[in-house]
């Protein structure tokens, strides 16, 4: 029994040493009864695979956005991500979109070295409120320098 207690103490102690995290802040908060709708797509013609031929992406990708007449748009954001430090300017339905913010993360892979990834977002609430239920096409995401 003494060994079990020592073992549990040791494991608990180790768990406190190997936990890494960052602070999380609320981005936006809405009060009331809201539902959530998301649409999305990919520019990847195949599954991501570091060992395979993944070095080409599609030039554009589309998704249909449909709202019923009784639904209102409170907020809308465009998110995009990929490999590298980031392409902060993309095109949505022919309109240039510049990121409000870009976030980067680096993953140190024992076989491939440091792999860098990015994610960007843009508040497009007015754009979506104006255009409503249509087909949205994202294009001009350029990550060719890292493929």
Identify the residue ranges that each predicted region occupies:
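Bacterial Sec-dependent N-terminal signal peptides
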Residues: 1-23
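Disulfide-rich extracellular domains of secreted proteins
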Residues: 21-147
């Amino acid at each position: 029994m003494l060994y079990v207690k020592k073992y549990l103490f040791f494991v608990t102690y180790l768990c406190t040493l190997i936990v890494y995290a960052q602070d999380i802040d609320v981005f936006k908060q809405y009060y009331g009864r809201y539902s959530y709708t998301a649409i999305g797509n990919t520019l990847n013609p195949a599954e991501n695979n570091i060992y395979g031929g993944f070095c080409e992406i599609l030039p554009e990708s589309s998704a249909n956005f449909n709202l019923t007449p009784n639904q209102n748009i409170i907020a809308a954001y465009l998110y995009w991500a990929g490999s590298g430090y980031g392409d902060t300017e993309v095109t949505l339905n022919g309109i240039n979109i510049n990121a409000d913010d870009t976030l980067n993360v680096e993953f140190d892979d024992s076989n491939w070295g440091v792999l860098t990834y990015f994610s960007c977002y843009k508040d497009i609430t007015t754009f979506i409120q104006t255009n409503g239920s249509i087909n949205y096409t994202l294009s001009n995401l350029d990550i060719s320098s890292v493929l």
